[in-house]
């Protein structure tokens, strides 16, 4: 059996990590060991925060809808309940956009929801 020299494989692996670490400060972008640790940490944080972003935006939308609904004299929870009764299927993102960009349309939606039985 012939001997396999791993120089090329190791170099490629290290270059890949150092390429991912480009832009990091100090030794985190120069030395393989610290760069590897930082890349692993960065990828772990990115994975976690892709999921967290969805939660954060949902919280933001709910806060905006609640603020706009209270200006119309209704709480967020009452508004969502009334929207379900009125069979209005507007998601939270769209409601928040309406509340911010078109308050008149949002108040119409609230009025329609308030009259629902």
Swiss-Prot record:
Keywords: Ribonucleoprotein, Ribosomal protein, RNA-binding, rRNA-binding. GO terms for biological process: ribosomal large subunit assembly; translation. The keyword Cytoplasm does not apply. Disulfide bonds: none annotated. Gene3D superfamilies: 6.10.160.10, Ribosomal protein L20. GO terms for molecular function: rRNA binding; structural constituent of ribosome. It holds the Pfam family Ribosomal_L20. GO terms for cellular component: cytosolic large ribosomal subunit. SUPFAM superfamilies: Ribosomal protein L20. It comes from the Bacteria. InterPro entries: Ribosomal_bL20 (IPR005813), RIBOSOMAL_L20_CS (IPR049946), Ribosomal_protein_bL20_C (IPR035566). HAMAP family: Ribosomal_bL20. Belongs to the bacterial ribosomal protein bL20 family. NCBIfam families: rplT_bact. This is Large ribosomal subunit protein bL20.
């Amino acid at each position: 059996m012939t001997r396999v020299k791993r120089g090329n494989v190791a170099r490629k692996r290290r270059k890949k990590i150092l390429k991912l670490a480009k832009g990091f400060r100090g030794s985190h972008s120069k030395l393989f060991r610290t760069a590897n640790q930082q890349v692993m940490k960065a990828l772990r944080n990115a994975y976690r925060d892709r999921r967290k972003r969805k939660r954060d935006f949902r919280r933001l939308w709910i806060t905006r809808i609640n603020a706009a609904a209270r200006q119309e004299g209704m709480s967020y929870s009452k508004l969502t309940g009334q929207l379900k009764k009125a069979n209005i299927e507007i998601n939270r993102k769209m409601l928040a956009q309406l509340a911010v960009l078109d308050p008149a349309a949002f108040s119409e939606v609230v009025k329609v929801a308030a009259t629902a039985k």
